[in-house]
Amino acid sequence: MRGDKETTNWLNKSLMKQARQKKLSIIAVGVLSTVAVTVGYLLYLYRGQRNPNIRDVKPKSKCYVLTQDLFDKIENWQEELSKDSVMLVLPEVAHLGNHLKLQLSSIEHKIVIFNNSSAVWSAVRHLKKYELVISRDKTSDMPVDLRRYVGQISHI
């Protein structure tokens, strides 16, 4: 009987040792995974600092909300719209938008004429251009949440 007890003790110790080794291997895999993920993330951050953001390299995109004031102040619409920009024409100055479309036929696709003002603001939200260029007298009509969709608002 004594032999059976010793065998049972030995068997229990052996099973406990295997369970301990299994736990240690699971912990080791977890630690190694955490270290690998951390190193990968740090490399990602380091490479991001070395390579400038694409948004910093390319010219800033612009969205113009056309009013009579804005039309009068900018002299060369050909140059302004040839960059990464678009012009949204308010209903009250649709005639100016049509005039510009005739003058600038090569970039007329960048001039969008709207029938109502709320559609203009919706388009500004969806375009998500970096800069919104707008006349000072139209800022009161501008929705409050618009600042979330553009990087900067310039008043002319």
Curated annotation (Swiss-Prot):
Q: How does it sit in the membrane?
A: Single-pass membrane protein
UniProt subcellular location: Peroxisome membrane
Give the main localization category. Answer: membrane
Family indicated by similarity: Belongs to the peroxin-22 family.
Keyword Transmembrane helix in annotation: yes
The protein, known as: Peroxisome assembly protein 22
Ranges that cross the membrane: 24-46
Q: InterPro entries from the entry?
A: Peroxin-22 (IPR024359), Peroxin-22_C_sf (IPR038613)
- The organism named in the record is Kluyveromyces lactis (strain ATCC 8585 / CBS 2359 / DSM 70799 / NBRC 1267 / NRRL Y-1140 / WM37)
